[in-house]
Amino acid sequence: MEEIKIGVVGLGYVGLPLARLFATKYAVVGFDLKKERIEALNRGIDRTLEVSEEVMKSVLRPSVPKRGEKGLYCSCDPEDLRDCNYYIITVPTPVDKHNRPDLTPLIRASETVGQVIVRGDIVIYESTVYPGATEEDCIPVIERVSGLKYNVDFFAGYSPERINPGDKQHTVEKIKKVTSGSTPGVAEKVNALYHSVIVAGTHLAPSIRVAEAAKVCLLYT
């Protein structure tokens, strides 16, 4: 059986609750560029108030957990991500004054993952994007940085985040997740990963593009 280790890139209101949830079952490394944020999180303090100090401390580990272990270690050092075999990117996608999406955070997060990814790894995007962005804008960045080939050496998934910040009733595990993967086998793996922690269940979309479109539809309904 595959031993799973997850790297969550971006520890904001989406990434942190997700990292905390996965850490109840798996080894998780939470990565964020903000050093002050990482230092606070490793003391159990989430200034966004999405995760309580008690809950944070219940999953925190003093060092990077190994595959097969459980728990969360937060870091701003990309090297701490190196042993992960699943990467979940949860960085924001702001819009400019013309309401066009700014993919800069996603591109930078993809570069970070590209530095540490190895053959067989799976990269899952949760950030809100337009249909096609994952495979047309983000994946080529990973290929360029890593030297690996998409759907040959590494694979991808998309599962749109649906967290409502500040909502203590509809927390991440209580919201049904749409999942997808770049091949049928990878799609099943991605779906199984989320299904193992999401009590509300999952829905496996037929493709990454369909899953991306599902999030766009949710924004306008």
Stretches with model-predicted labels:
Residues 22:
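Aromatic pocket-lining residues of Rossmann-like dinucleotide-binding sites
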Residues 89, 155, 162-205:
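Dinucleotide-binding Rossmann-like beta1-alpha1 core, especially the glycine-rich loop
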Residues 2-4, 27, 33-86, 92-100, ...:
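Conserved N-terminal Rossmann-fold NAD(P) cofactor-binding segment
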Residues 11:
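Glycine-rich Rossmann-fold phosphate-binding loop(s) that bind the pyrophosphate
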Residues 220-221:
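Conserved small/polar residues in nucleotide/adenosyl-binding loops
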Residues 95-162:
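Rossmann-like NAD(P)(H) cofactor-binding subdomain of soluble oxidoreductases
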Residues 15-16:
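N-terminal Rossmann-fold NAD(P) dinucleotide-binding loop
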